[in-house]
Amino acid sequence: MKFNEFLNNLSNYEPGKDIEVIAKEYGVKEVIKLASNENPFGTPPKAIECLRQNANKAHLYPDDSMIELKSTLAQKYKVQNENIIIGAGSDQVIEFAIHSKLNSKNAFLQAGVTFAMYEIYAKQCGAKCYKTQSITHNLDEFKKLYETHKDEIKLIFLCLPNNPLGECLDASEATEFIKGVNEDCLVVIDAAYNEFASFKDSKKHLEPCELIKEFDNVLYLGTFSKLYGLGGLRIGYGIANANIISAFYKLRAPFNVSNLALKAAVAAMDDDEFTEKTLENNFSQMELYKEFAKKHNIKIIDSYTNFITYFFDEKNSTDLSEKLLKKGIIIRNLKSYGLNAIRITIGTSYENEKFFTEFDKILR
């Protein structure tokens, strides 16, 4: 069977390996997953209780207006319901953005290394990709590329903080850059990890209400998969001016998010004890990863997320990843990004100690 030719130029996104699969494949009893930046404390207790109470409604289609979650988000971010769209993960809203702006005659701009789905979705539209030479968000390079190809570039991605590297621009740096962007070019600020960055440094904090008030061409993305521990329910959102949201709705299928996901997201936003514990654990444990890196002369980039990336000169990241798998520890090998590096999710103290113990042996 023949398929559309553009599929020949697409590669599959490589998600983190599954715990059950690794346990069976490697014959290990205990598996620790530090690969997909999931919440190490699991699902918020209030969300669990909400799911229990609503489990008998799984046969019902969701409220397609999503009014309860939209109103909760609108109150949190001081925006209107018409400024919000809910997606099956923020990935789906990224897809809306790309399909609304890109085609085979234009292009988009991103950092040298950033979230892989931007390029995967854009290639489905035949759009050209411009990347900075620097792997991180070097705004001088962004400006130079944008000015050179201004007529062609219709979409810019700023991943703040950046996945899979962890660095983050100050909010003021991002807004200053956006001022130089044409109003017909959509700037997507992927803030999937911004709660972590804001906790560590208030200068990284992004306010959607201020962004969309100042700029008509900005889309702010948020997710419930990281801080809020709902990755398995697939729910995220976008915040932008009403014209952008209205355009996205023409691409959205009805009932794109389950009723259980919608309910759980509202409950998760009300579980402050859970999110505070998550943030405090993350950055206290992050210090141990920095100490480990220093001890073993491993290069790192200061991370504003719930993960840290280790860069290697002589050791091979694929070999290291395989050896960790044999010990029942799943991390993310970044070879597919062209890096000799691994990304490690910050886990619980027990999970992290297990990683340090086993990785120390591997590095000897």
Curated annotation (Swiss-Prot):
<keyword id="KW-0663">Pyridoxal phosphate</keyword>
<protein>
    <recommendedName>
        <fullName>Histidinol-phosphate aminotransferase</fullName>
        <ecNumber>2.6.1.9</ecNumber>
    </recommendedName>
</protein>
<dbReference type="InterPro" id="IPR005861">
    <property type="entry name" value="HisP_aminotrans"/>
</dbReference>
<dbReference type="InterPro" id="IPR015421">
    <property type="entry name" value="PyrdxlP-dep_Trfase_major"/>
</dbReference>
<comment type="subunit">
    <text>Homodimer.</text>
</comment>
<dbReference type="GO" id="GO:0000105">
    <property type="term" value="P:L-histidine biosynthetic process"/>
</dbReference>
<keyword id="KW-0368">Histidine biosynthesis</keyword>
<dbReference type="GO" id="GO:0030170">
    <property type="term" value="F:pyridoxal phosphate binding"/>
</dbReference>
<dbReference type="Pfam" id="PF00155">
    <property type="entry name" value="Aminotran_1_2"/>
</dbReference>
<dbReference type="InterPro" id="IPR015422">
    <property type="entry name" value="PyrdxlP-dep_Trfase_small"/>
</dbReference>
<dbReference type="InterPro" id="IPR015424">
    <property type="entry name" value="PyrdxlP-dep_Trfase"/>
</dbReference>
<keyword id="KW-0028">Amino-acid biosynthesis</keyword>
<dbReference type="InterPro" id="IPR050106">
    <property type="entry name" value="HistidinolP_aminotransfase"/>
</dbReference>
<comment type="similarity">
    <text>Belongs to the class-II pyridoxal-phosphate-dependent aminotransferase family. Histidinol-phosphate aminotransferase subfamily.</text>
</comment>
<feature type="modified residue" description="N6-(pyridoxal phosphate)lysine">
    <location>
        <position position="226"/>
    </location>
</feature>
<keyword id="KW-0032">Aminotransferase</keyword>
<dbReference type="InterPro" id="IPR004839">
    <property type="entry name" value="Aminotransferase_I/II_large"/>
</dbReference>
<dbReference type="GO" id="GO:0004400">
    <property type="term" value="F:histidinol-phosphate transaminase activity"/>
</dbReference>
<keyword id="KW-0808">Transferase</keyword>
<comment type="pathway">
    <text>Amino-acid biosynthesis; L-histidine biosynthesis; L-histidine from 5-phospho-alpha-D-ribose 1-diphosphate: step 7/9.</text>
</comment>
